[in-house]
C-alpha cells in the first residue's frame, strides 16, 4: 500500500484491520445458536470466554475471548432476541475491534450504540467491570435503558450514574457489572472519593475497562479539561471600582488584545492609568493581587462575549460549552472570572472558591487498565490518540456506501457577504422541499441567522444553548420536507436525523428532493468538527449533500492565516471562486489544528507532573485510610499523649480514626495549597523563567521543589494538632481548633482554554460548574 507511512503516522492500519475483522465476522454464524434456549445461549457464552482472576493483593489478571467468532454470533443472537435488532456485519466488526482495544470510526447512523453495548457485554462476560462513558448524562441514561434488556439477558447488572443520585445510590451502581456515565460525573466521583476519611464512604468500585462514546470529543477535544472540586471561599474577584475602571480603558493605548483574541495585555500606559485612578504606587504590590484583579476584569470585558461564551438567564451568567453548543447548569469560571463577568453584566456578584483537587480528563481516562472507543471521526484524531493514549484507530466501512455529495466551499471576503449568501442559498434550497440543517459557530450567530431567514420569509427551528431542552423534539423533525433547522455544534447530540422526521410516509418524498442538506456557516477549528456536521447527512445510504460558506474574517482563517497575504479578485457579491482561495482556507485550518496540537502537547507536560504528584499523594492517602499508619506515627511522636488517651478508656478504633482524620486533614489541605501555588506559578511562568531555560523546565523545577516540602509540612502540622486537639470517645474535635473543611463543595469543568496560548496561561479559562 503506497501510503502505509501515512496510516502508521495516524496510529491506524485500516486495511489490515478491516480484512481481519471481516474474516472473523464472516465466521460468526448466529444461526448455529438460534435453536438454543435462553439458558443454553447464556451457557454457550460462558464457554467461549475465560473470566479474569484476582490475586491476593486485589490485582486482576487474565480474562480473554477464547473463540471470537462464536462470541460475536452469540451477541448477535442475543441482540435479536432482547432488542429486536439484527446487528449488521459492520456493527459486529466494530464490536470485534472494540474488544481488541481500538478506537473505531463508524459513520453517523451506523449503530455505534449497539456495537458499544455488545462490546461491553463481551468484556463483562470476562469478569471485567465496564464503564461505558458518554458525553452527557442524558445519553448515559438513554443508552442504559435502551440496551438494558441485553445486559439483563446475560445476568449482568447495569445502571447509569446521574448527578441527582445520593452517595448510597451511586455506591450501589458502581458495584454493578456495566455502568453508564457522563465523563464529568465519573471524574467528579473520583475527586470526591479522594477526600474521604473512612474507606466505607468511598462510592466508586474501580473499573477494568472504559468504552468511550464520541471518543475524539472526550479524549482529544476535552483531554486537558480539568475537573475541579472546590470549597466555598472568596476568590480574587475584581472590585466594582476596577470593573468600572476597565470599561474606561482604551484599546491599543491602555491594553492590547492579541491577534488571535486569546490574550489581553496591559500596556505601560495602562498600568500607569490604573495606578493613578486607584491611588496606588504600584500594581505589583501585595504579590501582584491587584494586577491579577485588573487582568481578570480585562479578560471579562474584552475576551468573553455574551451569547458566544455565555448567556444571561434569570439574572445569572450561564456558560456555554462551545464544543457541544449547550449550557451545563450551574457553570462557573475560576480565579474571580465568574465575578468579573457578573460585574460586567451588572448582576449580583457571587463568591469564588478554593480548589480542593482537580484531575484532567486525559488523566482520568488513563486510570482505566483497558480503553477503547467509538466515534464518527476517529481517523482525523488518530495522531493524538496514538501519541497521548497509545491507541490505534480502526475504520469500519459503512453498511451501505455513502452517497452524500460534498460541494466545494464558497469563500467570501467578509462575514456580512458570507451571511447574505447563506440566506439566499437557504431560500433557494427550501423551494425544492429539501430539509436543511444549518450549523453555526455560536449562539449569537445562530440567532442572527434565524432573524435574517425570518426576514427573508423562511421559518426555522433554532437549537442552541438557550433552548437545548427542546433538542429531542427539534432533531426528531429536522428531516421533514422543507424544514430548516439552525443549530450550534452538533457533536454529542446523540440523535440521528431521519429523513421525513417522525412521519415515515414522508421519507420517500424527502429522498426524492435529495435528502438532508447540511449548510456550514464558517469552518470549525478542525476538519474533524466540520465532518461531524457533514456526517448528519447521508446516513445509512440515504442521499444527502453539504456545503460550507466561509469568509476571510472567520476566526479559523484570521488565526490560521495571521501574517499571510492572499491576492485574489472577488466577484461583485464578495465570492472568491479561485481554487487558491480554497487551498488557503484549508491551509489556515491545518495551521489552527497544528496550534491546538501544540497547546495539547505543551499543556500535557504541565499536567503530567501534577498527575504524577497526585498519584503520590493518593498512594499516601490509601495507606492512611487502610492502615493504622497515622496513629503509629502520631503516637510514636508523642508517647505521653498517646498513653494519656488510652488511660481515658478511648478505644483503639476511635484513636486510630482520630489520628487518620488529623493526618488526612493536613495532607488534603497541603495538597490544595500546592495546587493554588502551581496555578500561580503557571500564570507567571513567563516572568519567572530564567534566561535560556524554557517555561516548562522552570515550572518543573519549582513544582518539584515545592512538592518535596509538602509531606513534611503535612506531617509536622498533624503532629502539632495531635499534641493540642481534644480527642474524646467521639473522635478528634478538629472544629474546636478552627480546622474546618469547607462548609460546601461543588464541582465544575474548566474547558481546554480557547483564550490561552501554548505558553500555558490559564487566566481566561472557561469553566463549567456542574454542581
From Swiss-Prot:
It is found in: Cell membrane; Cytoplasm. SMART domains: SecA_DEAD, SecA_PP_bind. InterPro entries: Helicase_ATP-bd (IPR014001), Helicase_C-like (IPR001650), P-loop_NTPase (IPR027417), SecA (IPR000185), SecA_Actinobact-type (IPR026389), SecA_CS (IPR020937), SecA_DEAD (IPR011115), SecA_motor_DEAD (IPR014018). It holds the Pfam family SecA_DEAD. It comes from the Bacteria. One of its GO terms (molecular function) is ATP binding. SUPFAM superfamilies: Helical scaffold and wing domains of SecA, P-loop containing nucleoside triphosphate hydrolases, Pre-protein crosslinking domain of SecA. One of its GO terms (cellular component) is cell envelope Sec protein transport complex. It catalyses: ATP + H2O + cellular proteinSide 1 = ADP + phosphate + cellular proteinSide 2. Keywords: ATP-binding, Cell membrane, Cytoplasm, Membrane, Nucleotide-binding, Protein transport, Translocase, Translocation, Transport. Its EC number is 7.4.2.8. Belongs to the SecA family. Part of the Sec protein translocase complex. Interacts with the SecYEG preprotein conducting channel. Has a central role in coupling the hydrolysis of ATP to the transfer of proteins into and across the cell membrane, serving as an ATP-driven molecular motor driving the stepwise translocation of polypeptide chains across the membrane. Monomer and homodimer. Part of the essential Sec protein translocation apparatus which comprises SecA, SecYEG and auxiliary proteins SecDF. Other proteins may also be involved. This is Protein translocase subunit SecA 2. It comes from Corynebacterium jeikeium (strain K411). The lineage of its organism: Bacteria, Bacillati, Actinomycetota, Actinomycetes, Mycobacteriales.
